[in-house]
Every structure is written in structure tokens, then in C-alpha cells.
């Protein structure tokens, strides 16, 4: 069964949207197999988003992602990577389809409420970043 990582970002946690977002995944038939609340340090945010290190938004992104608690989750289901990305909507909420998380809940392109892996390889890497094998056992 396919797995992906989704993160409820600090802006959504601060606005008490965890339940709203989780319900959207569950209503879509997606199983949440692991979930935790944590606060990334600046160094952890930089490591997680290292792929964007040369991009102009890297500093702001890592500052934002280390600004408050977030909720990484492992989602599981058939075609869950694509399904998750459809439920999240486009990165820029102005371009996101109506009814998606970002269209309904995001503040702006940076504070867009959720992150989702974009491919099986990145999903595996991102899951391993947040969850140990012990946490995934069972």
C-alpha cells in the first residue's frame, strides 16, 4: 500500500485546524497510520527543506517551519501521493481549486497550511526524517 508524508504546518496548527484537515483526509478514505505534534528547530527545518537551499524563499520557509508546532503524518492508501496532493490543492492558494485545503484554509503561498510529498522516493525520505522504524513497526 502506498504511503506519503503530510505535514500540517505551523499556521494551521496555530489556528486550530488540525481536526478540520485530518477529517478531510479521513473523508477521502485515506488512512492515517502515524501522527505526532512537534516543533522543528531551525536546523531541522533547514535539513528537511535542503532540496530548496538555493531557492530565494529558503530562509523564509525554514524560519516559518520552525516558528511553531507542526503535525507530520503518514497517510496510506491506493494512489495516496496523488490523492493527498489533490486534497491539498495548488501551492498558491489563489490558484488552488475550490474545496481544497489550501483554497479553503491557507493564508498565502508560504503559510499554505500543509505540505505533501510529491513522489514515492521523496515520500520515503520524508517519512524517515520524521518517524523512526520503531514508530512504524506494527
Swiss-Prot record:
Keywords: ATP-binding, Cytoplasm, Kinase, Magnesium, Metal-binding, Nucleotide metabolism, Nucleotide-binding, Phosphoprotein, Transferase
Required cofactor names: Mg(2+)
CDD domains per UniProt: NDPk_I (cd04413)
GO cellular component: cytoplasm
Catalytic activity: a 2'-deoxyribonucleoside 5'-diphosphate + ATP = a 2'-deoxyribonucleoside 5'-triphosphate + ADP; a ribonucleoside 5'-diphosphate + ATP = a ribonucleoside 5'-triphosphate + ADP
Cell location: Cytoplasm
Superkingdom of the source species: Bacteria
Protein name: Nucleoside diphosphate kinase
Species annotation: Desulfatibacillum aliphaticivorans
Species lineage: Bacteria, Pseudomonadati, Thermodesulfobacteriota, Desulfobacteria, Desulfobacterales
